[in-house]
Amino acid sequence: MNRRYVLSMGVSLVSLAVMVASSSQSLAQTQPASGEIALETVTVEGQGGSATGPVNGYVPNRTTTGSKTDTPIEEIPQSVSVIGREEIEDRQAQKVDEALRYTAGVFAQPYGLDSDTDWFFIRGFDAGQTGVFLNNLPLYQYGFGGFYIDPFVLERIEVLKGPSAALYGGSSIGGIVNLVSKRPVTEPLRYVETGVNSWGNGYAAFDFGGALDKDKIWSYRLTGKVSGGGWETEIAEDFRGVIAPAFTFRPNAGTELTVLASYQHMDLMHTGGFLPYVGTVVPAPFGRISRRFYYSEPDIDLYRREQAMIGYEFEHAVNDVWTLRQNFRYAHVDSKERGPYPFGYLGGAPVGPDFLLFRVGFNHHTVVNTLSLDNQAEAKFGTGPLNHTLLLGLDYKYYDIDHIQAAGGGTPISPVNPIYGVLQGPTVPYLDQDLTMSQLGFYAQDQIRYSGWIATLNGRYDHVSTKSTDKVGAANFSDEAGEFSGRLGLGYEFENGMTPYAAVSRSFNPVIGSDFFGQSFAPETGQQYEVGLKYRPTFIDALITASLFDLTRQNVNTTDPEHSFFEVQLGEVRSRGFELEAQANITAGLKAIAAFTAYDIEITEDSNPLLIGNRPNVVPEILASGWLDYTVQDGPFKGLGFGAGVRYVGFSYADNENTLKVPAATVFDAGIRYTRDNFTVALNVNNLFDNEYVSACDTQFTCNYGAGRVATLKAGYKW
């Protein structure tokens, strides 16, 4: 149950450092001529180094996402995308979902530039609730009980497309996003950055690291930022900060312990979204609602979050065959939200002279405590002509959420002449729930090589337990379920760099809740067939991935036709498609990325037979993007860099009946920067021509504008 669904349900029930922050220049790149600040050589400590460390330009080589081992991307029998620090910096991505806008198979920011949440769909399915991982450990979300990670503290953002339960247990059927933290370094690293955007939001950030002793047994990384100011809406306040310390203890070449921690504070007001179809997608009698329209109440508007995490990654090489690993994290979040949300026009249609929008009061208080533990034993050995990398694992996930949600009457507001300060009605709790979920899983993986052949075999069994207690009359429930997941992949690596592959996988995803009769929902299940080609040319530093897939998601919750406000599990959705992605370091100064996605997404089963054969709402079936970046390498303009990109989002629907169409949109981005010695300055403009478009609609009452033009100017210095 994601937060937008919670809000819609609440509305339906009623209506029926001392510095300011953003991204920083890459601090550990190996190509100073690219226009990034030329830093000293930085050695990244951690698991495998190259699989979690800096990406060379735009072209990744290795990953742990999709295997939990340090593996070349070509050997993963699924499509994997990696966005490195340099790409994040070149585009000045301020949020994780913003960084994903140029990734094949990902529809990012469907609800516009949400200031407190990252939204993305992978292969047609929402992955925000059960598809977010940090360092290969889950960041599960239920309702408003999720986590927010600022990209400034990340080294990489990686996307595994398609089912992943064979490795990770219950997770999004469409794919996952694995966020990779910055790790401690052994060489001195000192960097500061500051800037401001055209909305009046300023920031500053720092990134320090190095060895703590002459033998480099101890090393550290300290990353932080703080930001504050305006947002796109006419009335806005935004203040947030994060600090992320990390320490590594490496007493010898075979033993390593890294402690990773972070603390984040957010205090802000609500931004756009939740606007009606008439007045955004199509004009109302007064025209269209402004993108800058603020729909809440400044005197009571509140969004506040306190978030903290601490964990560790331990690795010990027992001998030349066996390596043991244990990864652990505890995370806590306490969030509060208050303010009215619009839900269509008062009376159902825009009526002059004020064209009032109906508003519903809403507030929640959510506290989450969660921990994850992953134990791994990896063995590398041979059996005759076969070379094996065997992984055995036992992991545990615990998630507890204690939350209260309330809704009530709100006063209407005019989108053409808003008047603020009107007293709002009281809210009444409709949910006061304490919910726990635990998952215990055992998994095994064997990566087998024979000559050019690469086989990957996965098997996993999970036991999932959920329990819910509600204090305001909603049904209590508890449930236990066991599920098996698996993956079988086969590829062949040719000497010219081409690796065709094929894979079949089975996945599951726990569903929390119960139907009208108190029967707990069964887990969603999914099956995928995928074939593709990964090509790493021998004559250029590039990676090209093409994939075809057929993915079916079963046990999808749909509206109960006999009991209002309840759901039944009668749904099935099939997503078939083609994805093409290319990343290239063409020359020392020229880099490029390109992505194309074409889907055929169809509702194949539903409690409403009229929906069968239709396309689900929100998701477009065509996505395309490209970004080109060039930096002058010598001469009087050495260090001057330019970047330009284009994003195309195909049309979608605002309803599953497919009667309300949301038009396609094309958006251009650009950037320019200059680096000299230890100093750099950069200007990026997103939505260069200020195209006004609707990114997606959940319903006819909840449409969302894409972000308007915003320019960000930053300056960075290293010493």
PLM features: what roles do these ranges have?
Residues 152-155, 166-245, 251-255, 308, ...:
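Outer-membrane beta-barrel translocator/receptor signature
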Residues 227-231, 244-317, 334-368, 411-439, ...:
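Acidic/polar loop-and-plug regions of large Gram-negative outer-membrane beta-barrel proteins
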Residues 313-329, 333-339, 500, 523-585, ...:
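Membrane-embedded beta-barrel scaffold of Gram-negative outer-membrane proteins
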Residues 248-252, 368, 387-391, 395-399, ...:
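Structural signature of Gram-negative outer-membrane beta-barrels, strongest in the C-terminal barrel
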Residues 59-81, 85, 94-137, 155:
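Extracytoplasmic beta-strand/coil segments of soluble accessory domains associated
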Residues 137-161, 179-181, 520:
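Short acidic/polar hinge/loop motifs at secondary-structure boundaries
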Residues 592, 647-655, 661, 673-719:
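C-terminal beta-signal and adjacent terminal beta-strands/loops
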Residues 452, 550, 569-656, 692, ...:
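Gram-negative outer-membrane beta-barrel transporters
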